Amino acid sequence: MGVRKLKPVTNGQRHAILYDYSELTRREPEKSLTYYYKRALGRSRQQGKITSRWKGAGNKIRYRLIDFKRDKSLIPAKVYSIEYDPFRSARIVLLHYKDGEKKYILWPDKLNVGDTVVSISYEDAIKGKELPDIKPGNAMPLRFIPVGTFIHNIELNPGRGAKLVRAAGLSAQVIGKIEGYAQVRLPSGEVRLINDKCMATIGVVGLAEHELVKLGKAGRSRWLGMRPNVRGTAMNPVDHPHGGGEGKTKGKHPESPWGWKTKGYKTKRGKRYSDRFIISKRNAGGKV
């Protein structure tokens, strides 16, 4: 499980580091849990003008419906397969529930085919029903997760579905409890208060090797729907504020093509209600 480095037979393979896909156990998705998805081409419907740069084409894909709520309380589910999902960096797991229903969830590290997972709702937990074990794949409200546990797939509002920590290799950590809230350290280093009725899944999102992947050639980017990103300094003055000049010239403050300041310029619009729940801000360097 992980990545493989190609032999430098061609220029496209020289620096390529790709997935080995050894963790996958099934090639075709569960058809009842997918639907056709038309890629966003980044152009207007009427005139075909670019509305969002660097997008276009890409392979045909079907969207996988992921269960981000984990609301089937106390119904055990068996891991049937580990599958690829073109819409996210993480792998997904197909669960077969005891009542016959099938659902996809994100693949936690160390969860294998044949394992059993279970979740419990806040309502059932406060009634005194037995809590699931603290092991990868099980889900429960933050109130009942021990301090120090690594978690992912975290809700911000009870019952609204997970919004945080869903990418490959990521995890957050419960570091405290206080008056109806859990203190959670996010991958960015930010410490935030989250309602302890919110659901979270135990464990770390699988495929931590994702950050090592290098596509190696432009063609693989096009397969993923990514078009070339041309530097502003390589354009003409009519096309970009950085354009023009003799040779490779700089000497201007970094700007977008429309004159907006970039690189260090704060783009957040005012304060948000949720800012009051931030105990300490994220690290400037990104992940902890």
Swiss-Prot record:
Keywords: Ribonucleoprotein, Ribosomal protein, RNA-binding, rRNA-binding
GO cellular component, one term: large ribosomal subunit
PROSITE patterns xrefs: RIBOSOMAL_L2
Any Pfam family matching the protein: Ribosomal_L2_C
Gene3D superfamilies tied to this protein: 2.30.30.30, Nucleic acid-binding proteins (2.40.50.140), Ribosomal protein L2, domain 3 (4.10.950.10)
Family listed: Belongs to the universal ribosomal protein uL2 family.
Protein name: Large ribosomal subunit protein uL2
Species this chain originates from: Hydrogenobaculum sp. (strain Y04AAS1)
